[in-house]
Amino acid sequence: MKLNIAYPAQGTQKCIDIEDEHRVRGFYEKRMGQEVEADFLGDEFKGYVLKITGGNDKQGFPMKQGVMHPTRVRLLLSKDSSCYRSRRAGERKRKSVRGCIVSSDLSVLSVVIVKQGDADIEGLTTETVPRRLGPKRANNIRKLFALSKEDDVRQYVIRREVTTKSGKTYTKAPKIQRLITPRRLAHKAQLREKKVKAIQASKDAAAEYAQLLAKRVAEKKSEKAEEKKRRASSLRTQSVQA
């Protein structure tokens, strides 16, 4: 079984081929997301704690979180499911996936170092791979450099050097997202003003309608009163004639 070990703290990754199956038996019957003490792998892993993140079996089928089974199963998967990428809107497909319980059928097991042990592992904890890209969002840049809201974020953007095929070198920086600029503030103020105007116009229209409705109701009442008066006078005239 191959063991794909990642160390996110230093951005390194290493694949170790373990031919003796007895050495990896400590992972059997464990589930994805479970943390395992890795002392059984050898002296170099003494004190290390590894978290199981996934794996593939010998036919290449991936492990799926939430499927409580040590073997392969066929599931009807949709757009939001892991282990499946839908090509069309609303498409679903029955796919073979492996359960989240580790068994001897796996060819590759992916783990992450949660706690470092006593000894260093060559090529994993001894090296540091810097991140290729820095943060892009304004708040994340502020958090990285401990900036206040008054500081200009644009001066702290992490730039990287890019070399073209012709050998020319230039620096490249990401476009800062969610950056508060005078233009953005003016746009927000404009939208707010438009909203206030719309609310006021709606209130004015409602008041005008209520006034018109009251006028119509009053007119109808007066018409009814006039009709009633006319009828009463005509009845009085008829009774006098009789």
Swiss-Prot record:
GO molecular function, one term: structural constituent of ribosome
BP GO terms, sorted: translation
Domain of life: Eukaryota
Residues with the Phosphoserine modification: S233, S234
The entry's keywords: Phosphoprotein, Ribonucleoprotein, Ribosomal protein
Entry GO CC: ribonucleoprotein complex; ribosome
Post-translational modification as stated in the protein's UniProt record: Phosphorylated.
Annotated spans, Disordered: 219-242
Biased composition (Basic and acidic residues): 219-229
Pfam family, one: Ribosomal_S6e
Entry-linked InterPro entries: Ribosomal_eS6 (IPR001377), Ribosomal_eS6-like (IPR014401), Ribosomal_eS6_CS (IPR018282)
SMART domains, per the entry: Ribosomal_S6e
Family statement drawn from the similarity comment of this UniProt entry: Belongs to the eukaryotic ribosomal protein eS6 family.
Name of protein: Small ribosomal subunit protein eS6
Native source organism of the sequence: Yarrowia lipolytica (strain CLIB 122 / E 150)
Phylogenetic lineage: Eukaryota, Fungi, Dikarya, Ascomycota, Saccharomycotina
